[in-house]
Design a protein with these regions (language model features):
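N-terminal leader/targeting segments and the immediate start of mature chains
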Residues: 8-45, 188-197
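Flexible, surface-exposed loop/linker segments and immediately adjacent secondary-structure boundaries
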Residues: 87-129
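Short, hydrophobic/aromatic-rich segments at coil-to-beta transitions
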Residues: 30-34, 57-61, 126-132, 151-156
Length: 197
């Protein structure tokens, strides 16, 4: 479901605002973080943990670690989904697959961020800023996205979707430092079936 960092950066004493949110996000060309994902639907809660690495080049890798073991990766051409339990790697043409998904906030350049999202508000209280965004595409399953910052550190991303789900990613140990995009590739274990779609 849900990838960053390098050009200009928001100075640490500056606050995130409606006016500078996209500039701030675009300044983060790389992201590497662990997360806890909590999905709430009809009062049922599901919690999974994992890691995300993402780049504004549009590439990313999400590793779900507990309780499921699944890796999702994307380069410019394909989406790769490795399910070690099923011993299967699915390869799907990428096309516009992530255009209207929350991962686009972490992998899109500033021009695409402005095309995809409207910033409704950024409210700051006691060093915590919550920004509310809406997708501009009426056909998107995502209805609202909330980004929470502590100071200028991204603390969480929450989205509400048209299926009645609330999905929250709490981030831990965030790094905005550049990394080799080779880290975004999936290494395929022996005995895995590869399925092209």
């Amino acid at each position: 479901m849900l990838s960053l960092l390098l050009t200009t950066t928001v100075v640490s004493n500056e606050t995130i605002s409606k006016e500078n949110l996209f500039d701030f996000l675009h300044s983060k060309q790389y992201l590497k973080t662990s997360f806890t994902q909590t999905t709430l639907v009809d009062l049922n809660e599901r919690v999974v943990s994992g890691n995300i690495q993402a780049s504004r080049s549009g590439n990313f890798k999400i590793e779900y670690l507990d309780p499921i073991q699944e890796t999702i990766s994307a380069d410019k051409e394909f989406l790769y989904k490795l399910d070690t339990e099923l011993e299967q790697l699915d390869i799907v043409p990428r096309e516009e697959y992530f255009r209207n998904t929350p991962i686009s906030i972490l992998i899109s350049n500033i021009e695409n961020l402005k095309k995809l999202y409207s910033i409704n508000s950024c409210i700051e209280e006691n060093l915590i800023t919550v920004c509310s965004l809406s997708t501009k595409d009426e056909n998107s399953f995502v209805e609202k996205i909330f980004l929470q910052f502590v100071g200028t550190e991204l603390d969480s991303l929450t989205y509400l979707d048209s299926f009645g789900q609330s999905v929250n990613f709490d981030f831990d140990n965030i790094s905005w430092e550049p990394f080799s995009e080779n880290q975004l590739y999936i290494s395929i274990p022996e005995g895995i079936d590869v399925v092209y779609h």
